[in-house]
From Swiss-Prot:
SUPFAM superfamilies: Nucleic acid-binding proteins, RuvA domain 2-like
Chain positions covered by the region annotation Domain II: 68-146
Name the record gives this protein: Holliday junction branch migration complex subunit RuvA
SMART domains documented for this protein: HhH1
Superkingdom, taxonomy of origin: Bacteria
Flexible linker, as annotated region: 147-157
Function, in words: The RuvA-RuvB-RuvC complex processes Holliday junction (HJ) DNA during genetic recombination and DNA repair, while the RuvA-RuvB complex plays an important role in the rescue of blocked DNA replication forks via replication fork reversal (RFR). RuvA specifically binds to HJ cruciform DNA, conferring on it an open structure. The RuvB hexamer acts as an ATP-dependent pump, pulling dsDNA into and through the RuvAB complex. HJ branch migration allows RuvC to scan DNA until it finds its consensus sequence, where it cleaves and resolves the cruciform DNA.
Cellular localization per UniProt: Cytoplasm
Pfam hit, one: RuvA_N
Species, as recorded: Prochlorococcus marinus (strain NATL2A)
Amino acid sequence: MISWLKGEKVHTWKISSRKGVVLNVGGVGYEIQLLPKQIDKAEVLNEFELWIHQIDREDGTSLYGFIEVNQRDLFREIISVNGIGPQIGMAMLEEFEVPQLVNAIENKESNLLTKTQGIGKRIAERLIVELRNKLQRFTDNDKTIHENKNDIEANQFSKYIDEIYLILNSLGYVDNEIKESIKIITINEKENSLLLNSSSAEEKADLMDKHLKEILMKLSEKST
């Protein structure tokens, strides 16, 4: 059973709504499905370290990769629920960050869970019944999710800035240019952190597009 892989990216792929990478690990190519929100990072990084969940079937083996181990472990809990397959599990982790999803399940927020494509009211309620008392380990390192909300938001904002940095770096901009230009985002860190925390994956992508356009416009003005 494969649990973790580190290797060089040789290809990114897309099949319908599924996206992923092929990693060269010791001369062997592993095809791994990723969360779509991780694909932007996949486009600019050459080396990956991924936590893996492996599913073996008669027609082949499927690998699901995650940047963070708690994403992989929560994915395993989700697909242990009767009627929920790996694609719905991936969709849920695409829609929500781990703390948000754990919080929704523990607080019986079935309406929030149904925001995920493929999750109806009945499946959402089944998730809550089967998992709400099994997720304590995801919050053991924190007093409660609510008490650490500010830390979670700050961490999300930091990751968001890192992604923007990588994209700008891949476009040829240097460190000093990037650090100066992203001040238009960091100057409103609190506001943008709250916005990120309450946004869906699609809304986050739209926000990133908006910020990138603003930054590129600022960089263009400086070069003229």
